[in-house]
């Protein structure tokens, strides 16, 4: 009886330990020094080789980025809340430097907690447009290269589900922007809403060497969501 009681107490103790809430923790200082390094910035230059744009990224994706909502449609992986690819690795800071000058100039006016992507120089290379992703959507911003200042142009209503949501026009002053229509139907969450039809797959045809594709449209709900993009 004593041996059986001891075993029972041990098992009970193990169960209690296993159910403890464990939070995210930092590794030791030695490991952190090796893993948590600062990435070198990526560089983009104008064709006249007068200015360069330095783009800085986090070494790793944040927990918020890894935990974001993801919808898989027709080979795309998007965030249905922000309407941009869920696989984007964002830029968090921008600096400008004259090629003939060693000093880097911090771009002023950038959004707080910047999540920047879709960087594009204007045709005359005097301005740089980019998008910033908020918790609700995607905004359009523009930088004046000579003064290294950024300014927001739109609210967070851009449609970046199918690539860059804007294009520069030849006049260097106009941007053609894709925005979400106000009457766009809401995307259907397969995990919450009743699907519009069953999942259907076919096995007709003969064997072939064709490649396979991920995240194909599987039912009427997927089709409706893809049309809404």
Task: State the predicted function of each range.
Residues 1-22:
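Bacterial Sec-dependent N-terminal signal peptides
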Residues 18-229:
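Beta-propeller folds
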